[in-house]
Amino acid sequence: MTRIDSVRAATGSAKDSVLHAAEVVAPYADTAKERAAHYAHEARVRLAPKVTLAAEQARVQYGAHLAPRLEQARTHVPPKVELAAQEAALRTRKAARQAADYSRPMIEQAVAAAGPVRDEAATRAAAALVALRGQVTAEDIQKLVRKHERRARTGRAVRMLAVLGLVAGGAFAAWKWWDKQANPDWLVEPPEATEVPESGRLTSVDGSAEAVLDPEVQAKEAAEEAAKRDDQA
């Protein structure tokens, strides 16, 4: 016997037991119902005159004792106290109206905000019902869960990269500002000038042959060479 057969057999036996219990209890239930109706009718017949008499007596006593005293107390109340009571009642009604006018937009806003939540809950309930009916497998549910987890991880990574980029940009900007403050342009020393050799013939740019110099330059070079020869002699 399979599990389904055993469940069906247990369900059938439970159903038979319930039907048998209902058949056994039915006569007692009918008898109890009849007795309850009889007792209720009897109590109503016996208590109705007493209740009516008590109500009449209370009405008479109120008219004879309490009503005159209330009227007398009302006449002895100072006008200022009565006016204050009336003003308090008016203020209470005004405050109630203001509270209603103030709370109505908030309630409407809360209801409007609860709409998407209600729709989401209905969607999830429908999805759960479909899953219970077997139209969605456990594998599909696991895929959805993994998809949501991937989205959450991607969102966290993007937020982390954005924060790191902002921090790095701020640090670079701060470093540039500090470097500019520590080393201003006017404080930077110019590079040293390179020395030009005292003598030597000028050559062409490609170094292939000597360039044709100006006669004055040639005369100056000749004088310098003659002076060097005299010194060496």
UniProtKB/Swiss-Prot annotation:
Cystine residue pairs: none
One GO MF term attached to the UniProt entry: DNA binding
Compositional bias (Basic and acidic residues): 217-233
Region (Disordered): 190-233
Pfam families found in the cross-reference section: DUF5324
Positions of the DNA-binding region: 93-112
Keywords, comma-separated and alphabetical: Antibiotic resistance, DNA-binding, Transcription, Transcription regulation
Highest taxon of source: Bacteria
Signal peptide as annotated in the record: none
Single GO BP term: response to antibiotic
Record-linked InterPro entries: DUF5324
Reported function: Seems to be involved in the regulation of nhs expression.
Protein name per UniProt: Putative nosiheptide resistance regulatory protein
